[in-house]
Curated annotation (Swiss-Prot):
Family: Belongs to the universal ribosomal protein uL14 family.
A UniProt-annotated Pfam family: Ribosomal_L14
CDD domains associated with the record: Ribosomal_uL14
GO molecular function: large ribosomal subunit rRNA binding; structural constituent of ribosome
InterPro entries the UniProt entry points to: Ribosomal_uL14, Ribosomal_uL14_bac-type, Ribosomal_uL14_CS, Ribosomal_uL14_sf
Keywords: Ribonucleoprotein, Ribosomal protein, RNA-binding, rRNA-binding
Role: Binds to 23S rRNA. Forms part of two intersubunit bridges in the 70S ribosome.
GO cellular component: cytosolic large ribosomal subunit
Annotated protein name in UniProt: Large ribosomal subunit protein uL14
Alphabetical list of SUPFAM superfamilies matching this protein: Ribosomal protein L14
NCBIfam families, per database record: rplN_bact
Length: 122
């Protein structure tokens, strides 16, 4: 469950390390984002010579949340940290690699490129 001012780790090699959510997309009154939702983020920490730099405003897909994800079969999955993958305006990942596991709920939200780059899908 991600809201405005939430800090997230970046799970790709775009050059950003930490980002902060500045808007949840999908309706004017929408307060929270979950796995697979698109948010607008500001890069707070970045590595030198990366594709993005500190202060850049970008879109991102939430790929991991510390809040439980409930599945239709009754099982629950949760992660240790909140993480996102930076995307461009065509909804393609900025980085070429994804780090860490991603849930299969991303498939239902049509983020197939992220699923294919991920080392593990839970």
């Amino acid at each position: 469950m991600i809201q405005m001012q939430t800090n997230l780790d970046v799970a790709d090699n775009s050059g950003a390390r930490r980002v902060m959510c500045i808007k949840v997309l999908g309706g004017s009154k929408r307060k929270y984002a979950g796995v697979g939702d698109i948010i607008v983020v500001s890069v707070k920490e970045a590595i030198p010579r990366g594709r993005v730099k500190k202060g850049d405003v970008m879109k991102a897909v939430v790929v991991r949340t510390a809040k439980d994800i409930k599945r239709a079969d009754g099982s629950v999955i949760r992660f240790d940290t909140n993480a996102a993958v930076l995307i461009n305006n065509q909804s393609e990942p900025v980085g070429t690699r994804i780090f860490g596991p991603v849930p299969r709920e991303l498939r239902a939200k049509n983020h197939m490129k992220i699923i294919s780059l991920a080392p593990e899908v839970l």
